[in-house]
Structure formats: C-alpha cells, structure tokens
UniProtKB/Swiss-Prot annotation:
Residues 45-49 are annotated as: CDR1. The JM22 clone described as a variant of the public clonotype differs by one amino acid in the CDR3-alpha domain. This is M1-specific T cell receptor alpha chain. It comes from Homo sapiens (Human). The chain crosses the membrane at residues 244-266. Residues 1-19 form the signal peptide. Glycans are attached at N36, N42, N160, N194, N205, N241. The gene is TRA. Disulfide-linked heterodimer with TRBV19*01J2S7*01C*02 beta chain. The TR primarily interacts via its CDR3-beta domain with M/matrix protein 1-derived peptide (GILGFVFTL) displayed by HLA-A*02.01 in a 'peg-notch' recognition mode. The alpha-beta TR associates with the transmembrane signaling CD3 coreceptor proteins to form the TR-CD3 (TCR). The alpha chain of TRAV27*01J42*01C*01/TRBV19*01J2S7*01C*02 alpha-beta T cell receptor (TR) clonotype that is specific for HLA-A*02:01-restricted M/matrix protein 1 immunodominant epitope GILGFVFTL of influenza A virus (IAV). Classified as a public TR clonotype, it is preferentially selected in effector memory CD8-positive T cells among multiple HLA-A*02:01 carriers and confers long-lived immunity against IAV infection. Can cross-recognize sporadically emerging IAV variants by molecular mimicry, inducing immunity toward different influenza strains.
Length: 268
C-alpha cells in the first residue's frame, strides 16, 4: 500500500514537471556591438518565480535577477527583466550590447515544490566594432605632378587639426563624414598645395597625430585619373520615348480639330 502511494506521488511529480517546460527563443543570437536585443522565455504553466542566469564559457551559471510578482519589471544597468502578468512568460532586454555580454542566458522557473525548471538557453554572441586606424592618403594629379592632396581620416574626435605654418599649404577644418551606405561616421581633414615637394608626412606637422597613423610612402601615392564612361542608348527605351512623343502629337491634333469644329459650329 505504501509502495503504491509512493509511486502515485512520483507520477504526479513527473506529470507536474513535464507540464512546466520552459521554451526560450531565440536559441542563437549574433549581433554587432551597440545593438539592442530581446530574449524570450515562455511556458504553458504558472510559476511562483522566475530567474535569469548568465553562463560564460568554462564557468558555471551566475544569477542575474529573480522576479516573483506578475507584471514586475527590474533593471540592472543595461539589462531589463520583465515577468508577465500571468506569470507564464518573461523577457530579457539588453540595450547597447557589449562584447562582455557574450554568453549563455538561461531562464529558470520556480514551482510550489521549490524546484527549478530550466530552459535550454539562448547563446548570445556580441561582435566588437573594429575601429579603423587613422591614416593619411596622398592623391596626385596624373596630368600635373605639382598638384597634390592629402586626406587625413579615421582619427579620434579629440584630435585637433591645426593650420600649417607654411603659407603655401591649405588645411580644411575637421569634418565628420556620414557614410550612410556603410552605416558609420568618420572624422576627416584635407590638405593641399601646389608645391612640387609637398609631402603628406609634413602636411599635418602642427596637429597632434596618433602614433599609429598610417602614412603612405612617396612611391605609393594614388594617381587621380579621369575615367570617362561610354554612353550607350537603349533601343527599347528610345522606342518608348518616340511612342510617347507620337501620342502627344496625335493628342494635340485631335484637340486642335475639335476646337476648330467647335468654332465653326458657333460661327454658323
């Protein structure tokens, strides 16, 4: 009798556990540094509490937060945790993700028996933004060796670009280039001179240039060449244009004929 009762209790516990499964989505997530993300945790059953853990490679899970009240919202710096009103779901939102946020995120629901039911986890990978090193590029006119332009780009916003003491060298103020097609911005400045011995290595002498700035060798300067693209007409497009012109002429003739007939009727 006691054995049957114990087996019945065991089956009840197993049935309760089987209905307390947690589903996490997405299972894998890879984003760039600075982006936002949301991880979801759902169940068909009600939990008395819900916990979020983060596990880094080679280490054990670390508790981030515990929520117990339906509709509860907790914030931990850039992390926001929310427990659903029905206590069946939860979400983790990370703002401006950093490479240090990389890891496995686990949600765990607590039942009335005091045990925890874990989800399968969400593996997050945050790729760091690789800022390009500052560089100076020299552009020479292919038709005249006396004309040269230096482009100083990808430098830090704290860098000061000063005018040259040489009256024959002209330097623009620091500007921000918005590379919308590549989704990033870059600081830049331009220097130019008509002097034949003008060198980019000396153009920004009065400015504080980072030590890791790339300077091209005199042999590796870029020749600016004018490339003329040949223009070829499209026969189909030409036919369509001629058709439109023809229809317009026909419309004008019809309108003129109608106007002439109307004037004749009025005059008679």
């Amino acid at each position: 009798m006691v054995l049957k009762f114990s087996v019945s209790i065991l089956w009840i516990q197993l049935a309760w556990v089987s209905t307390q499964l947690l589903e996490q989505s997405p299972q894998f997530l890879s984003i760039q540094e600075g982006e936002n993300l949301t991880v979801y945790c759902n169940s068909s059953s009600v939990f008395s509490s819900l916990q979020w853990y983060r596990q880094e490679p080679g280490e054990g899970p670390v508790l981030l937060v515990t929520v117990v009240t339906g509709g509860e919202v907790k914030k931990l710096k850039r992390l926001t945790f929310q427990f659903g009103d029905a206590r069946k779901d939860s979400s983790l939102h990370i703002t401006a993700a950093q490479p240090g946020d990389t890891g496995l995120y686990l949600c765990a629901g607590g039942g009335s028996q005091g045990n925890l039911i874990f989800g399968k986890g969400t593996k997050l990978s945050v790729k760091p933004i690789q800022n390009p090193d500052p560089a100076v590029y020299q552009l020479r006119d292919s038709k005249s060796s006396d004309k040269s332009v230096c482009l100083f780009t990808d430098f830090d916003s704290q860098t000061n670009v000063s005018q040259s003491k040489d009256s024959d060298v002209y330097i623009t103020d620091k500007t921000v280039l918005d590379m919308r097609s590549m989704d990033f911005k870059s600081n830049s400045a331009v220097a130019w001179s008509n002097k034949s011995d003008f060198a980019c290595a000396n153009a920004f002498n009065n400015s504080i240039i980072p030590e890791d700035t790339f300077f091209p060798s005199p042999e590796s300067s870029c020749d600016v060449k004018l490339v003329e693209k040949s223009f070829e007409t499209d026969t189909n497009l030409n036919f369509q244009n001629l058709s439109v012109i023809g229809f317009r002429i026909l419309l004008l003739k019809v309108a003129g004929f109608n106007l002439l007939m109307t004037l004749r009727l009025w005059s008679s």
